[in-house]
Amino acid sequence: MLDTWFSSALVPFSTLINDPKAFDIYLPSSVLVTGYDILFFWVARMVMMTRFFTGRVPFKNVYIHGLVRDAEGNKMSKSEGNTLDPLDIIQGVDLESLVKKNTTGLRQPEKAPIVEKKLRKHYPEGINEIGADALRFTMAAYATLGRNVNFDVKRADGYRNFCNKLWNATRFVLMNVEGKDCGLDPNAPMEYSAPDQWIWSEFERTVQEVRKAFEDYRLDNAANAIYSFIWNQYCDWYLELSKVQLNQGNEAVQRATRHTLVTVLEQTLRLAHPIIPFITEELWQKVSVVAGVRSEDSVDSLMVQSYPVYDPAKVNTQADITVNELKAMVDAIRNLRSGMLVPPSKKVPLAVSSRDGEARARAEKLTPYLQTLGRLEEVIFTDDLETVRPVGSAAPVAVVDDFSLMLIIKVDVAAERERLSKEIARLENEIAKANNKLSNENFVKKAPAKVIEQERSRLANNEQLLASNKEQLAKLPQA
């Protein structure tokens, strides 16, 4: 009878000895995936055995990942009752079934009440159905250079939301492009806007980043780049900008918008497929037909399509500048509305001034986007904001690059001063309490690192809000 590690050390070549063709193809293999805890027991022995018997190395690269631990950093062990069955995460499990599974077969049965208490604390409603793709994405995002992975189901919940976001984005695109002219006729006129060109630039940069991440075995970087592009750029910005173009653009603009929507999405599904294969395959089967990639009756799979390759020709620097200005202006408008407590349903006028003629010309072309995303009644361009400021108004001004922005609203100075003073007092009180906590040695010693980090983050956020409120108060005219 052979020792476990001895027989395991023979794996790279033992099944290939009688097949010379397979021997030449598969030895050495490209990469071995393993954990650092068995480097000596298995990896080193495979190298030694394979070199001794064949004169070759067993594999070209070794990808070493961290050990998966529970949310508190303890090593997962069935006998300790802190393991999680991947199927329970994928399919979901109720609390009682989870407790029963994790308190059965414990190495120390007397610990069952402790295990049960922890489970009921961490999973009071059991585990929601996460799905296979969301779990895969979670593990890819966790694959950092660290030696340990403290697995938290809440993070997997976040990636389930990401998969839902991709699904809903695809529904929106199909709803707006199916049965319509998507620019598949090369002779049809198309007018690509700055947002159309910008989203292609963002996609190409993401392709470059993801491919490099895969080449470097940085699955976390690949997952984060895909997440950022889909959620932050494509969904949060381009889909919203495309609505303006579909509603207000001429026929050529609408055609170009539909073409951009569906082609960028089709390529994005290819990009994300290695990490989330099931949802991307399902969506691609519909998107690829509309994008003209395959016919409706074909049985092609996304799995065998070519992977996106970086194309620098699609990176448009001028479009990037224009859209980044637009995004900054929209963010500033939203901050102004929030700071002045303007209800989301209320449309108000905006005044914009700039001394740069070229910048002003660019901004004037962005008016439809500003009105829609900023929920504005109109956009007024002026050389001096004071000429359009309502008499006695204390409306604040936001500065974005070469632009000054002001909502044309009459503000009750006395009421605004009172509101800001109360908010400043509240924030100062919160900051004082946080500083007392963090200066308490007992708290810092005994509190979990996560709690301390949350307290520091809350303190930094409140300090930032305090500075902003004081700045607004200082800008109010004196009575």
Where are these regions (language model features)?
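A conserved hydrophobic secondary-structure block that centers on an alpha-helix together
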Residues: 145-146, 217
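Aromatic-rich carbohydrate-recognition surfaces in CAZymes
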Residues: 36-39, 94, 127-128, 134-140
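Extracellular beta-rich ligand/substrate-recognition surface
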Residues: 19-23
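Short, solvent-exposed helix-loop connector elements
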Residues: 147-155
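The substrate-binding groove and active-site-proximal loops of carbohydrate-active enzymes
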Residues: 28-38
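Feature 926 captures the class I aminoacyl-tRNA synthetase adenylation module centered on the KMSKS loop
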Residues: 1-5, 10, 52-132, 154-479
